[in-house]
Amino acid sequence: MAVKKRSIFEEVGQGAKAPVPQGGSIDRGHGGARRGIRLWLMALFLLVMAMIVVGGLTRLTESGLSITEWRPVTGAVPPLNETQWAAEFDKYRDSPQYRLMNAGMTLAEFQRIYWWEWGHRQLGRVIGLVWAVGFLGFLAARRIPRGWWPRLLALGALGGLQGGIGWWMVASGLEGDKVTVESTRLATHLGLAFIILGLIAWQALLLGRSESDLLQARRQKEGRLVTLTTVLIGVAFLQIVLGALVAGIDAGRGFPTWPDMNGTFLPADMFYVPGVETDWRNPAWWLGLLQNPGFVQFLHRMAGYALAALGLIFWIFGRRSRHRATRGAFDLLAMALLAQILLGVGTVLSAAEWQVAIAHQVGAVVIWVLILHARHLALYPRVGSIRKGTL
């Protein structure tokens, strides 16, 4: 067998083609699908964010009880003529809110609050439709990456659960002498909305990078920052729920002073529950405290201070990250927290004026997403080039 002679000066590998790097099998064939699913998730994210904002405006305009039936499908069509409007108005006039708060309301006034609630529910239907079309479409085309279909299916299941909780919340305001929904049910509804929004955002962040990139990045994760941002997620969620409890009983309007609460640190009658003796061992007393404006407003303020303080401390740790993108994420989060503090104080001083209150709610969404973004970069750092200064 002849042996090919080689010059002693021939470079290693000369004359042979270097193998072309191939993407890992974990990503092969799914790059386009990942981009498509990510765009779909981003559309869902924007819709859910709009749903939260419209829900807040529906509450602030006291429109949430204008539709007294739950018709997930047929309710998509609003009243189209005078007869249908009159029938819808008659249903509302049978509600305790009309009898006790809005007696004498005209049809035109009813239509204004009706459209807010109908728009809120219609947006929920649109979200369900966008999810179903996207999920079934990607599933039928077999474009969902391995292991992802349960996560995407879970989003739809949570969306359906959220619709049921929404009606459960509304139904609480149609009983007895109620003129508003139960604040605890409102908090459940808003809390689940933020959970859904967070899951969508997290999955979109994961799909923004290949599986192989994420696998390599995770080897350089910054464990301390992951832990700190996880703590921040818990505190932020608690603050969101407390904010919903405040909004549910209009507690923000009762104490329009800051940093005090109507001249005192602890509001008067903070632990008073009508008809229930003050007893730390009585569950009814604890539940009653959630209806005490001073109690929930005080907790909301204290949780806000805690969130701001932790955010500042964690920002100091975040600035020590060796990755520029991670440091930038913590910078953005710190600035958003400062802005949210100002919006919170403004909401208090304006006695929850709707423009300031809704901006405060949007601020909560922004902070929620920025915390998740910071946690994502702590868990999956973007490793750049030292020469280019991107570390």
Curated annotation (Swiss-Prot):
GO terms classed as biological process: heme A biosynthetic process
GO molecular function: metal ion binding; oxidoreductase activity, acting on NAD(P)H, heme protein as acceptor
Required cofactor names: heme b
Record's GO cellular component terms: plasma membrane
Pfam families (UniProt xref): COX15-CtaA
Key word Metal-binding present: yes
Protein name: Heme A synthase
Species this chain originates from: Cereibacter sphaeroides (strain KD131 / KCTC 12085)
